[in-house]
């Protein structure tokens, strides 16, 4: 049996992994006996019952305990050696990393120094540029102030000129007002004269109407007399014809009696019967002679009646001529009065116009006044153009001043921004110098540590922390610099956008100035045109009053033409009356003349009728051609053949019937019939319209929506689809 002490093992928290119970190991380092073949589960010795065994084994137990402590110390020392080796390796690795980081940081430090030098150079350049811009802006501002003062002086001068122009314009306006007052007075006098003349014309019209009525009554009376005379002449003609017949019979009887007397003279010389017959015949002769005298008297009366008719017509024509002459005389009197009024008005105008002594001076005076008006308008136009130019220059000055103020404000903002940038750069420089000093201290510590040859873990940790803090500061500094760069880029972009906007505004202003210059040139050309029109004497119908004569040349020519036409018609009527009288006087030739006249009229009317019939036939042919073209076009465009038929209802109302047949119809029975009456169109029922589909479409499109075109279009589409698709 060999007593052995097992190697110290760490107790595990898990009870199943430890080979011994926890009570045996924790009860005061009790001795465990191992054999060559140890038992799987040795039980601990019970020392509570046998005190003598415990006393016997005390020294051995102490030795074993010391041995175990030594072994534990040895194992811990080995472990510490291994740990120190690993730490040494890690420190060497950390040292190499720190050296690399030191080199990297030194490179960064040198790069930051270079950036700092570049920033200082940029700062100097920016300061110099800012000073140059400030000096330039101050110079521009002084120049703008000087130009403003000069323009103010010019403006004052222009204002004085404007006041002078306004005073001259006021005087011209006063003159124009005076002239307008005179014109209003003249227009008032002209209106009064017009009213008076209108009243005179109305009175003359009334008098003319009364005279016309009186003359009409006289004419009717004379016509009645003429009709009575004609009736009397007709009666006398009939009596004359009767007497002529009687006279002819008497002459025949006289000739017979003369023959008898000549025959009886040879037979019987003097007998009582013959004497009685002679006496009787003598009495009849006397009676016949009396009748002949009466017939001659009637004939003379008839001739007197015809002469009276002729005299009546002559008197009527004379009366008409006298009336026309009277109307002309009245018109001449009116024109004379108007001319006298115009002369009086012109005399008053001559008296009112200063510097005019005779009518020849009016033209000169008017030309002088026109020249004065033209000069005043030119002065007013020049003053207005100067005022516009001054306004434009003022606007330009104000814009320049605003631009200068804005530029000064921008320069101030830039200077403030540059000051803030300088302050920020100074702060950054202080931070960089602090970091530089820290890095120098770190480098010195590293050099000292390298010179000493041994570096403790705490010093390495402090160095690493210092490097990490410097790295973090450097990263923060880089981020700040990047943010500053971004801000500067944004500022530059804003400034560029502002510059672009200002350039666009400048371009717009230049375009506006050019457009204003073009407008000013156009207005000047219009002013020159108006001045030339004023010089030539052009006028507008809305503003200029023109004196017009009542009886102008056109009116007089029209009156002359109407008078000539009336005279020609009167001459024709006279000729016709003479022809009728000749026809009446010459009964034998009258029939022939009337027949020839009637035949001529009939031939003329036949010729006119023939020409009219030819024209009507030509119109009918042209209309038929056009209507056929129209029907074909309607058929091609709308798809329906249209046949029109007109008839009358029993009550006499005309009705037009239209028959429509689609070009896509499958049979001749597919026809639609419509009636058109006084603006209303209605569909008629037939076999095709009474079909189910057609009746439904008629109910929807015509009865409900009152749209015949929609019905025909839908029907066309359905028939087209049936014809082509099915």
UniProtKB/Swiss-Prot annotation:
InterPro entries hit by this protein: Mad1
Domain of life where this protein originates: Eukaryota
UniProt-annotated stretches for the region Disordered: 1-30
Keywords noted in UniProt: Cell cycle, Cell division, Coiled coil, Mitosis, Nucleus
Single GO biological process annotation from the record: cell division
One Gene Ontology term, aspect cellular component: nuclear envelope
Subcellular location field: Nucleus envelope
Major localisation: nucleus
Coiled coil location: 68-246, 272-625
Tagged with keyword Magnesium: no
Pfam families registered for this protein in UniProt: MAD
Known role: Required for the execution of the mitotic checkpoint which monitors the process of kinetochore-spindle attachment and delays the onset of anaphase when this process is not complete. It inhibits the activity of the anaphase promoting complex by sequestering CDC20 until all chromosomes are aligned at the metaphase plate. Required for anchoring MAD2 to the nuclear envelope.
Family label: Belongs to the MAD1 family.
Assembly and binders: Homodimer. Part of the mitotic checkpoint complex (MCC). Interacts with MAD2 and NUA.
Designated name of the protein: Mitotic spindle checkpoint protein MAD1
Organism of provenance: Arabidopsis thaliana
């Amino acid at each position: 049996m060999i007593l052995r002490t097992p190697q110290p093992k760490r107790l595990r928290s898990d009870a199943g992994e430890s080979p011994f119970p926890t009570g045996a190991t924790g009860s005061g380092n009790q001795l465990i006996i191992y054999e060559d073949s140890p038992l799987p589960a040795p039980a601990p010795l019970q020392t509570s019952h046998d005190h003598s065994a415990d006393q016997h084994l005390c020294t051995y137990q102490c030795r074993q305990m010391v041995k175990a402590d030594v072994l534990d110390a040895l194992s811990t020392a080995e472990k510490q050696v291994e740990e120190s080796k690993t730490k040494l390796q890690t420190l060497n690795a950390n040292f190499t990393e720190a050296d690399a980081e030191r080199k990297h940081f030194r490179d960064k430090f040198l790069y930051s120094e270079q950036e700092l030098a570049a920033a200082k150079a940029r700062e100097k350049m920016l300061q110099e540029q800012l000073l140059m811009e400030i000096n330039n802006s101050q110079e521009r501002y002084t120049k703008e102030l000087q130009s403003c003062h000069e323009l103010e002086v010019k403006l004052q001068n222009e204002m004085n000129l404007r006041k002078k122009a306004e005073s001259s314009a006021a005087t011209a306006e006063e003159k124009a007002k005076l002239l307008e007052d005179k014109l209003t007075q003249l227009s008032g006098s002209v209106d009064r004269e017009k009213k008076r003349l209108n009243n005179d014309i109305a009175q003359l019209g009334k008098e003319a109407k009364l005279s016309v009525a009186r003359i009409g009554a006289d004419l009717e009376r004379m016509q009645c007399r003429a009709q009575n005379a004609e009736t009397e002449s007709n009666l006398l003609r009939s009596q004359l014809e009767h007497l002529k017949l009687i006279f002819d019979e008497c002459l025949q009887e006289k000739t017979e009696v003369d023959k008898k007397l000549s025959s009886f003279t040879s037979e019987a010389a003097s007998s009582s019967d013959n004497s009685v017959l002679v006496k009787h015949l003598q009495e009849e002769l006397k009676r016949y002679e009396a009748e002949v005298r009466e017939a001659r008297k009637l004939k003379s009366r008839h001739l007197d009646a015809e002469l009276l008719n002729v005299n009546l017509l002559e008197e009527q024509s004379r009366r008409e001529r006298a009336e026309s002459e009277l109307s002309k005389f009245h018109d001449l009197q009116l024109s004379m009065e108007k001319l006298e009024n115009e002369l009086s008005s012109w005399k008053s105008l001559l008296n009112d116009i200063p510097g005019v002594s005779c009518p020849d001076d009016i033209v000169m005076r008017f030309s002088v006044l026109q020249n004065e008006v033209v000069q005043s308008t030119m002065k007013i136009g020049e003053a207005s153009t100067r005022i516009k130019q001054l306004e434009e220059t003022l606007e330009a000055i104000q814009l320049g001043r605003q631009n200068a103020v804005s530029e000064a404000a921008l320069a101030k903002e830039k200077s403030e921004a540059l000051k803030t940038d300088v302050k920020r750069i100074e702060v950054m420089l202080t931070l960089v110098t602090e970091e530089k000093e820290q890095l120098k201290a770190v480098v010195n510590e590293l050099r000292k540590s390298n010179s000493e040859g041994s570096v403790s873990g705490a010093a390495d940790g402090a160095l690493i922390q210092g490097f990490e803090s410097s790295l973090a500061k450097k990263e923060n500094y880089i981020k700040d610099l990047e943010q500053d760069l971004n801000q500067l880029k944004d500022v530059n972009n804003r400034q560029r956008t502002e510059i672009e906007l200002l350039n666009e505004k400048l371009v717009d202003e230049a375009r506006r100035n050019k457009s204003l210059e073009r407008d000013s040139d156009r207005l000047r050309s219009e002013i020159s045109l108006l001045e030339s029109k004023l010089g030539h004497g052009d006028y507008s119908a809305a503003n200029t009053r023109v004196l017009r004569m009542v009886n102008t040349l056109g009116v007089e020519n029209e009156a002359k033409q109407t008078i000539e036409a009336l005279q020609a018609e009167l001459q024709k009527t006279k000729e016709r009356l003479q022809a009728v009288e000749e026809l009446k006087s010459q009964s034998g030739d009258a029939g022939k003349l009337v027949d020839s006249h009637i035949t001529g009229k009939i031939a003329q009317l036949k010729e006119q009728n023939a020409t009219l019939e030819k024209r009507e036939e030509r119109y009918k042919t042209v209309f038929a051609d056009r209507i056929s073209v129209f029907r074909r076009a309607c058929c091609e465009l709308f798809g329906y053949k249209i046949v029109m038929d007109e008839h009358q209802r029993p009550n006499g109302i005309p009705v037009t019937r239209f028959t429509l047949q689609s070009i896509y119809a499958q049979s001749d029975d597919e026809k639609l019939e419509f009636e058109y009456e006084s603006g209303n169109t209605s569909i008629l029922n037939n076999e095709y319209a009474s079909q189910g589909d057609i009746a439904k479409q008629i109910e929807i499109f015509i009865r409900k929506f009152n749209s015949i075109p929609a019905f025909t279009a839908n029907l066309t589409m359905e028939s087209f689809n049936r014809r082509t698709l099915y």
